[in-house]
Design a protein with these regions (language model features):
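Short, low-complexity intrinsically disordered segments enriched in A/P/G/S/L with frequent Arg
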Residues: 5, 19-27
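N-terminal leader/targeting segments
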Residues: 3-4, 33
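N-terminal mitochondrial targeting presequence
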Residues: 2, 9-13, 18-19
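Pyridoxal 5′-phosphate
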Residues: 12, 26-438
Length: 438
């Protein structure tokens, strides 16, 4: 058993056909939703930079916002803004109703047992820290083991490392296979004696979709709780937290057409009831005395202070918007689009491009990290920007994974429900332009 192994595995699937100017046919990659119609819901796509249309391929970082979210938030601030859970006057009561309505919408969206299981946080990073430091401090002692994977975002690594420094817990790691999947061949051994198994549902670098139900079941069989970082999957596919087997899950509003500044922690009610509060102050108490305090009921127990009221209401609008589109439609659209992107890059660039991630679009999300002709990712992203193609360049808050795949940085293009095959074509054309420069 290797704990915290930094062994380097050099692999990727490499596109190795001759470079041509052909494009895959759209008929062979039929989309399940009409992105041209969807795009009309997003006002930013009516804008141009230097006379060129926006090609936004950074949705794994943050998504664009539809009119309904913008309008809902603006209308609330103009006509209905008031504090929640504090005042009896009509304006405040109506604001509270809208806020709690958003909570109910989120609960339904992920099939939670009830709205009490939905805790609003600043973002998913705060939610992960809340579990590590609230649940973790109450339940983990020196020598206890937390199992993570090599494909985690820093938000699911650093809090546990901080707890390791504070409490002396042990960290173990699930390695990767050569085809960018989790290596589950030794999972039973790795889970021996583990108290927590915390993992991502989908890699923000590789696009790999992990078998959440299988991993949660394995964790429970070993006597561990299962924590799932769902930031990259909730915006892109149907989510059923009850069926997943997870004990805790978290995701962020801004990646799913909602505003920044609000995230969601979902937890099984019994676990949340037993977990001590993370922050103290107003709203999270039912009584305060000179000799102590009594916590409020769920979920207020974990929502100290004035929350991001407008942002939560915006998240509710985003959830309703995505529900209207249909999350299965979003998933099928991205499978077809992923297939188109992979075929396009293969036919255009052959072995000039190396994509780090599964080749099968059924096993991945529409997030593609790649190396191109030895051009530094930061240089490449700046050249792509000249064509108004927006991509991410860097380590993507996953430095341990970068080391494992043998890259200091990659260029990442990530697609969403509003992206089209024309966006993929624009990416390929911009890469051609970069070839001419470098």
């Amino acid at each position: 058993l290797m704990v915290g192994s930094s062994s380097r595995v050099a692999w990727s699937w490499q596109l190795n056909l001759k470079r041509t100017a052909t494009r895959p046919t759209e008929a062979s990659h039929k989309m399940s939703i009409d992105s041209a119609v969807i795009r009309r819901d997003f006002p930013i796509f009516g804008s141009e930079v230097n006379g060129k249309p926006l090609v936004y391929l950074d949705s794994a970082n943050t998504s664009q916002k539809p009119n309904v979210v913008i309008d809902t938030m603006t209308k609330f601030m103009r006509e209905a803004y008031a504090p929640i859970n504090r005042s009896a006057y009509t304006l405040a009561a109506n604001a509270t109703e809208q806020y709690e309505g958003a909570r109910a919408a989120v609960a339904k969206f992920i099939n939670a047992n009830n709205a009490r299981e939905i805790v609003f946080t600043k973002n998913a990073t705060e939610a992960l820290n809340m579990i590590a430091f609230s649940w973790g401090r109450a339940n983990l002692q020196r020598g206890d083991v937390v199992l993570l994977t090599h494909m985690e975002h820093h938000a699911n690594i650093v809090p546990w490392q901080m707890l390791q420094q504070e409490r002396g817990i042990e960290l173990r790691w699930v390695p990767l296979t050569s085809d960018f999947q989790l290596d589950l061949s030794s999972l039973e051994t790795l889970l021996a004696g583990v108290k927590v198994f915390s993992f991502t549902s989908m890699s923000n670098v590789l696009g790999t979709i992990n078998p959440v139900e299988k991993l949660c079941a394995a964790a429970h069989a070993a006597g561990a709780i299962a924590i799932v970082d769902m930031c990259q999957s909730v915006p892109h596919a149907p989510t059923d937290v009850r069926a997943s087997g997870a004990d805790f899950a978290m995701f962020s509003s801004h990646k799913m057409c909602g505003p920044s500044g609000v995230g969601v922690l979902w937890g099984r009610e019994a676990l949340l009831e037993a977990m001590p509060p993370f922050l103290g102050g107003g709203n999270m108490i039912s009584e305060v005395r000179l000799d102590g305090f009594t916590c409020a009921e769920l979920p207020s127990k974990f929502e100290a202070g004035t929350p991001p009221i407008v942002e939560v209401i915006g998240l509710g609008a985003a959830v309703n918007y995505l529900t209207g589109v249909g999350m299965q439609n979003v998933r099928q659209h991205e499978i077809a689009l992923s297939n188109y992107v992979l075929d396009l890059l293969q036919s255009r660039f052959g072995d000039d491009i190396t994509i780090h991630g599964p080749r099968n679009p059924e096993l991945r999300g529409a997030t593609f990290s790649f190396a191109f002709r030895g051009i530094h990712p930061h240089d490449l992203s700046q050249v792509l920007d000249q064509s108004n193609v927006c991509v991410r360049a860097g380590h993507h808050c996953a430095k341990p994974l970068m080391k494992i795949i043998g890259a200091n940085a990659t260029t990442r293009a990530s697609f969403y429900l509003y992206n089209t095959t024309e966006d993929a074509d624009a990416l390929a054309d911009a890469l051609d332009s970069a070839s001419d420069i470098f």
